[in-house]
């Protein structure tokens, strides 16, 4: 697929979102993620309204946008299994392992991925990396455990920074971890989740994307 618009980053995000929407089938329970790329997806979903049975949203922000467009947004507990979940990423490697959570919705995003039959990740090519970790890794933490968790993360080689004035939709805080070269995403995802006080972290390796749709500066769309 090629598009003729000026290939700035927003247009690349929009192109990836439009391509992902083509995977929507009739009577679908659709999971919708969070972030700037997903914002373009939500706009595109208007063209698929007759195919979408209901929508499960990973954040309050996306829920507001979806409801404003007239979509039936339901709680995951009532939706059951999600047929297709579409979301963006902050980083993506060749194995479709991701860093997500720059928008602080990582826990709900991870729940949606776990409950979905298929997960499509939409990115522009600036998000593609060989090794995860250049983007700071978000970790959602119970507030009273912040200092303890930070000390444990330092032992793993990271430099945690408290994301001030950010409270997640679940009422928790975010530590952004810098200077972690994530050579083994599966191992680190597990190790971080085992720290008492951690809700989850932004590595998506135990359950990576099934398909990545990437918009490139040359105007093409690559799927892998």
Swiss-Prot record:
The keyword ATP-binding does not apply. The active site is at 109 (proton acceptor). Disulfide bonds: none annotated. Substrate binds at residues 34-37, 87-90, 100-103, 127. Coiled coil: none annotated. Gene3D superfamilies: 3.30.70.260, 3.40.50.1360. One of its GO terms (molecular function) is ribose-5-phosphate isomerase activity. Catalyzes the reversible conversion of ribose-5-phosphate to ribulose 5-phosphate. This is Ribose-5-phosphate isomerase A.
């Amino acid at each position: 697929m090629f598009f003729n618009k000026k290939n700035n980053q927003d247009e690349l995000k929009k192109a990836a979102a439009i391509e992902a929407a083509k995977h929507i089938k009739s009577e679908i329970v659709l999971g919708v993620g969070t972030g700037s790329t997903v914002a373009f997806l939500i706009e595109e979903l208007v063209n698929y309204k007759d195919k979408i049975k209901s929508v499960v949203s990973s954040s309050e922000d996306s829920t507001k946008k979806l409801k404003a467009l007239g979509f039936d947004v339901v709680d995951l507990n009532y939706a059951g299994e999600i047929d297709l979940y579409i979301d963006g990423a902050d980083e993506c490697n060749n194995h479709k392992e991701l860093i997500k959570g720059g928008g602080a919705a990582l826990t709900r995003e991870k729940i949606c991925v776990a409950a979905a039959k298929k997960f499509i990740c939409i990115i522009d090519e600036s998000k593609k990396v060989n090794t995860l970790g250049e983007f700071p890794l978000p970790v959602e933490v119970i507030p009273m455990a912040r200092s303890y968790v930070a000390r444990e993360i330092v032992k793993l080689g990271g430099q945690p920074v408290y994301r001030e004035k950010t409270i997640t939709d679940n009422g928790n805080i975010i530590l952004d971890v810098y200077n972690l070269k994530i050579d083994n995403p599966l191992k680190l995802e597990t190790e971080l989740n085992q720290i008492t006080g951690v809700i989850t972290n932004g590595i998506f390796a135990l359950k990576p994307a099934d398909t990545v749709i990437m918009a490139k500066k040359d105007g093409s769309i690559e799927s892998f």
